[in-house]
A protein has these predicted regions:
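Bacterial N-terminal signal peptides that target proteins for export
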Residues: 1-8
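C-terminal motif of bacterial Sec signal peptides marking the signal peptidase cleavage site
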Residues: 15-18
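Bacterial signal peptide processing site
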Residues: 20-22
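Extracellular mucin-like PTS domains
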Residues: 29-32
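Short solvent-exposed beta->alpha transition segments
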Residues: 37-38, 44-49, 56-107
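Surface-exposed, charged secondary-structure patches
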Residues: 80-127, 134-142
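Low-complexity, intrinsically disordered terminal/linker segments enriched in charged
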Residues: 134-160
Length: 160
């Protein structure tokens, strides 16, 4: 009887070891993105692409430009899902007009207009990349993204 138990135990150990061994290769880590130039011209180009992506519903690249504090508010998947399920904003494309240093805590300001309304986004240069600060740029959106999905839909008045 002890021999049967020992054989069974050995078989379990061998099976467990076989199941846990990985025959696949580890995923290659993505190549790091090239650094962004630390210039007003580079920020203006990036802010224009950022606003165009948002205006046209390409939300992934928008989220990727958010700073860490902003990304901590909502996951990328939830951000994209909410905007796909409940599109917000104007049907008019924005026009990004300028970028300059001059905001709080060293922020750079990207000035843009939507349908004649002048707006400002706050950007920082972090680890050789331009990142968007949602908290400074759009505090009202922060409140919306902290809501549950059903509260978000109700607050924006979308049919869901």
């Amino acid at each position: 009887m002890r021999l049967l138990i020992a054989i069974a135990a050995s078989a379990v150990v061998l099976l467990a070891a076989g199941c846990s061994a990985s025959s696949s290769h580890p995923a290659a880590s993505p190549s790091p993105l090239p650094p962004d130039p630390h210039t007003a011209a580079a920020l203006l180009t990036i802010a224009r692409a950022f606003n165009h992506d948002y205006d046209t519903g390409d939300y992934g690249p928008v989220y990727e430009r958010w700073d860490a504090r902003s990304q901590a508010i909502i996951t990328r998947a939830d951000y994209i899902k909410r905007h796909k399920d409940c599109p917000s904003g104007s049907q008019t494309l924005s026009r990004t007009e300028s970028a300059s240093l001059g905001g709080p805590h060293g922020a750079w300001l990207a000035q843009y207009a939507i349908g004649g309304q002048q707006l400002t986004d706050y950007w920082f240069y972090v680890h050789r990349r331009w990142v968007f600060d949602l908290v400074l740029s759009n505090p009202a959106a922060v409140k919306l993204y902290r809501m549950s999905p059903s509260q978000f839909v109700a607050a924006l008045g979308c049919a869901h």
